[in-house]
Amino acid sequence: MEIKEISVPQQGVVADYMNGKKEIQSCFDYMLTEDAFKQRVQDLREREFFRQDLVTHLLEYNTKLQAGEATIQNVKALGDENTYVVIAGQQAGLLTGPLYTIHKIISVLQLAKEKEESLGVKVVPVFWIAGEDHDMDEINHTFVTKNKKIKKTIFHDRNPKKASASESELSLEDCRKWIEEIFKTYPETNFTKDVLQFIDDSLRKSNTYVDFFGHLIMKMFVNSGLILVDSHHPELRKLEVPFFKQIVSKYKEVQEGLHNQQRVIKELGYKPIIETKSNAVHIFMEIDNERVLLEDNQGKFVGKDGTYSFSYKELIEEMERSPERFSNNVVTRPLMQEYVFPTLAFIGGPGELAYWSELQQVFHTIGFRMPPVVPRITITYIERDIATDLHDLQLQESDPFFNNVDKLRENWLSNQIEEPIDERFVEAKKEIIDIHKSLQQFVKKIDPGLSAFAGKNEFKINEQIELLERMLKRNVEKKHEVELNKFRRIQFALRPLGAPQERVWNVCYYLNQFGLDFVDRVMEKPFSWNGKHHVIKL
């Protein structure tokens, strides 16, 4: 594996944050400097955490996932007041979801190791599985290449229920068949059998989406020391009850903090992305197997436009009685994370970084400081055949990241032709239509009744010219079919669906191609935190 860094253009909040623009940096409590991380350690030392209760829960949860010894030791270390965490999170995508989930975990592992060495304190890596998520459409699919097209392959569970990812039971047999269908689209390699067995070992131990995700991630990172947490685990929810109560008692201040911070964001020229109602309580409650967002209505806490209604006392009593019924929304999830974990740093993608910039004053209303927000490592993998295609087309490895691949293809094709086809046909159509318009005037003078027919005649002639243009283009493309297929392969591999590779493709393709130690070998590579994109040649 060979690693190379390229500067990929960023936009908006992310670009300005990474470029050190002071205005947007003022929306965060810590800059990404070593002094800021030292200050963060000092700030965390002044706070209290329910460490022992958390350790008890995490030991039980990670042991069930058959965690390695390094993970168990890291969990136990959390009981020490001088241990801190680097954390990131994601939904429980089937087969771990898009590659960026793996890249987030690699980011967490690397930053935790680096900060432990530089700060001289124990820093452990934590990955937060968003088990409360009810949106199965976000996690029930993966993308594959089939018949020279990119296909979204959806897992259709025979017994779908309106439940969270932590509670949604998987039909193991259906899931196994779905996985087999995915692997039929991959080339069979020396690793295929082992990878399928690896996945099936995790599937057999799983009852829910979160189980499957957790087992697969733990198995993939078994020697890394990674700690997993299911955000919707009933035992964790019990530990969170005091903070849920605090949110309910301060929801107006939370909403005001969000509103004020979004006003700051607007004044800086950015567009806020968090949308909430002015009466939002920022907590979900599970009612009749549905996740209902609570709102304030004249002192009552209501859901679904008043279908459900609770007094403050009733809501608090229900939190104490059934904490597993409650979960956070996009505003309070970061707050709950801050309450539970002594967070040295949060690692997020571009979208997360943008919405965290809207939360600074929300953190302050609770008496927290927002942790350092570190953009995750971004990676694209270039296989040998794709590297060869780039070379054959005289393209740089960075070209697909700076230019639309379709545009690169069009430019290349136009360079193979002496005279541009589009321009010549535009000229020809104009000349022919001008002549025909004159002819129509002549016909109209002699026989006005033929005017409509003359107009149709113009349309037919134009149709035939366009047909000739299409046939010429098709023949030119056929002549250069080999090269154009290279462009298609490059696009599918590096910019599938016009998106970054890591947002579409799944890690299982790479495990199948390069073996079960693929992720371990990627983790051995040195990654920088300078905001540049990492290209790994395989």
Curated annotation (Swiss-Prot):
Source taxon at top rank: Bacteria
Coiled-coil regions, chain positions: 460-484
Keywords: Coiled coil, Ligase
GO molecular function list: ligase activity
Keyword Coiled coil among record annotations: yes
E.C. no: 6.-.-.-
EC supergroup of this enzyme: ligase
UniProt cross-references to InterPro entries, sorted A to Z: Bacillithiol_biosynth_BshC, CC_BshC, Rossmann-like_BshC
A Pfam family: Rossmann-like_BshC
Family membership: Belongs to the BshC family.
Protein function: Involved in bacillithiol (BSH) biosynthesis. May catalyze the last step of the pathway, the addition of cysteine to glucosamine malate (GlcN-Mal) to generate BSH.
Protein name (Swiss-Prot/TrEMBL): Putative cysteine ligase BshC
Organism name: Bacillus anthracis
Top-level taxonomy: Bacteria, Bacillati, Bacillota, Bacilli, Bacillales
Encoding gene (name): bshC
